[in-house]
Amino acid sequence: MTLREITICGLYGYIDKHIKFHHDINLLVGINGSGKTSVLNIIGWMLNPASLPHLCITQFSKISLKITYKSVNYELVCQQTGKRMTYDIVREGAKRKSYHPLGILLLPFPEGFVERPDFKKAALERYSGLKPNENELKTYTFLQQIPKPFILGLDRTVTRESKDPRQNAPMSAVEQIQEIANTNYSR
């Protein structure tokens, strides 16, 4: 599976993002509060039907995630309009829809919902029992089968530990990636 492009409109009521992905490594860089973590979360939520509750409690107007899976291009489109959220899978170039859209009735949230972790937790629990109906089963199953991306968070304050005090210095992003790859994926 390859991520090709993501467009997010109206995230939290004021953030719009459009990112075209490269075929190899992609880095998201920005100041605090610019939406880096939100973009990564949304990508994960869009590709995992078990994470639909997170999309239900996140304010946005439209999310479009373009992917290639098994050599076929798809556009995953999630929209919130009023009291409904719909999630469509569109096979690019198809003359008719291959997948029935997922439809979710959105619950009203109290004022200050975003700032209250207890409200968010309760809302997630209310949506946790979401199950596809008979028409939505093919869509839900497709989403379960899509491989999930590997997201590697890098913190610029990471240091390498060494017995030599001269080597206890901050690591660059490239050094962090090499360290993680060598530690976790070497045989």
Describe each region flagged by the PLM.
Residues 1-15:
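N-terminal pre-Walker A segment at the start of P-loop NTPase domains
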Residues 51-53, 75-76, 135-142:
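Catalytic micro-motifs at enzyme active sites that drive phosphoryl/nucleotidyl and oxygen chemistry
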Residues 84-187:
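Electropositive, glycine-dotted interaction segments
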Residues 3, 60-62, 147-149:
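Extracellular structured ligand-interaction cores
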Residues 17-21:
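Conserved A-loop
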Residues 11-12, 45-47, 132-135:
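Short beta->alpha connector loops
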Residues 15, 71-73, 159:
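Primarily extracytoplasmic ectodomains and periplasmic/lumenal surface modules that are beta-strand-rich
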Residues 22-74, 80-82, 87-94:
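Phosphate-binding glycine-rich loops of NTP-binding sites
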